[in-house]
Amino acid sequence: MFKKYSIFIAALTAFLLVAGCSSNQSSTDSEKKVTLTISAAASAQDALEEIQKNYEKDHQHITIQDNYGSSGALQKQISQGAGADLFFSAAEDKFKKLVDDGDIAKKDSTELVGNEIVLVVPKNGDSPVTSFSNLAESEKIALGTPESVPAGAYGKESLTKLSLWDKVKDKIVYGKDVRQVLSYVETGNVDAGVVYKTDALVSKKVNIVDEAKADTHSPIVYPLGIVKDTKHRKEAKEFYEYLQSDEAMKVFEKYGFTAE
């Protein structure tokens, strides 16, 4: 009887040890280090970096890797299979292309924030430009390439609506993204540039001299979505939801974005 009891106790102990190890293993697995890649419009960089720092502080097993660039270039990268878990675009048409092609499910997307287009000049320069009305007096103007840079496309729309495009198109120096356009203005290589308000606000080297009225260009909306081929759907979904939270939205608004 005692022998049977001893065998039972030994078996129970072994079972509990195995169960305990499994439980610990499960706990460890659930906290495995995960790196999320977000392909994001260059204009969102400052806000995103602060938001990500806050998120990583509370989710220490998550590392967020950024891939910044023009929305058009990022869209092409994702279409060609470049690894990304989320896409944060500054252009609805580039984002819609991925949805239409099945790279992002509509149910996994949202219109997150909005922005504005402004005219900037070098802070310590002697630019003749004081508003859109006398932009034609400038020698060089920086603008994002309209075909791939959303800010450039919106800027061209505004310049066309204001009957300025034909007067200034031969003076334009094109940038690969909005940050390059801003850099041209900051260094005084151009007299003025057309950028997002959010970019102008984070620069200490430019002055905003005018804002493009909303009726001069298409609505500026930044869509966010989870890439269908993500290998970390659970973690991508959690960060996707966090970006829509009140906490994250306060940071976006701090950098000049508007809530949608």
Swiss-Prot record:
SUPFAM superfamilies: Periplasmic binding protein-like II. Molybdate binds at S43, S71, A151, V178, Y196. InterPro entries: ModA, ModA/WtpA, YvgL-like_PBP2. A lipid is attached at C21 (N-palmitoyl cysteine). Keywords: Cell membrane, Lipoprotein, Membrane, Metal-binding, Molybdenum, Palmitate, Signal, Tungsten. GO terms for molecular function: metal ion binding; molybdate ion binding. Residues 1-20 form the signal peptide. It is a lipid-anchor. The keyword DNA repair does not apply. Coiled coil: none annotated. A lipid is attached at C21 (S-diacylglycerol cysteine). GO terms for cellular component: plasma membrane. One of its GO terms (biological process) is molybdate ion transport. It is found in: Cell membrane. It comes from the Bacteria. Belongs to the bacterial solute-binding protein ModA family. NCBIfam families: modA. This is Putative ABC transporter substrate-binding lipoprotein YvgL.
